[in-house]
A protein has these predicted regions:
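Extreme N-terminal starter segment of soluble prokaryotic enzymes
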Residues: 2-4
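Acetyl-CoA-dependent GNAT
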Residues: 7-79, 83-84, 96-98, 102, ...
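Active-site acidic-Proline motif in GNAT/NAT acetyltransferases
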Residues: 83-85, 89, 113-114
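Glycine-rich acyl-CoA binding loop
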Residues: 88-96
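Conserved active-site alpha-helix within GNAT-family acetyltransferase domains
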Residues: 93-94, 114-132, 138
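Conserved GNAT acetyl-CoA-binding A-motif
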Residues: 102-113
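Terminal substrate-recognition subdomain of acyl/acetyltransferases
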Residues: 141-143
């Protein structure tokens, strides 16, 4: 299965936001964080960066997206999603390999501590947990 990659377009904003909101709603601890503020912050960040997201396509259909960028001299994978119903088919592995091919050095990411499936995925692909990132999240790194 071959994936192709391109920059996101404005018309994909709602789909990317839906994935981000699903993740926040599932794993965020709303006892510590105001839900509407958390979702508003996600919306602002994604709207600002939409054209920096990479869309993965299979046979012309968008199957996932990621946002890889430099933060204070460190490469971070800030968002990474395989769209339903394409999960569990090796697409995430191919997408992460694409991210790794674009970086000379370490990739950092934050993941919700409760997102056991994602943590396992990242560990299988060479990431390790480096510590807490705050707000119920963990830092992970792959060199």
């Amino acid at each position: 299965m071959e994936l192709s990659y391109r920059r996101a377009q404005l018309l994909e904003l709602s789909r990317i936001l839906a994935q981000c909101f699903e993740n926040v709603n599932r794993y965020e601890d709303f006892a510590r964080v105001d839900r509407s503020e958390a979702l508003s912050a996600v919306r602002r960040r994604v709207q600002k960066q939409i054209f920096n997201f990479t869309i993965a396509e299979k046979d012309g259909e968008a199957v996932g997206c990621y946002f890889l960028h430099n933060v204070n001299g460190r490469v971070e994978l800030e968002e990474f999603y395989v769209f339903d119903p394409h999960r569990g088919r090796g697409i995430g592995t191919q997408m992460l390999r694409d991210c790794q091919s674009k970086v000379n050095g370490a990739i950092w990411l934050r993941v919700y501590a409760g997102n056991v499936r994602a943590i396992g995925f990242y560990i299988r692909l060479g990431f390790h947990i480096c510590g807490e990132a705050g707000n119920g999240m963990l830092w992970m790194q792959c060199i």
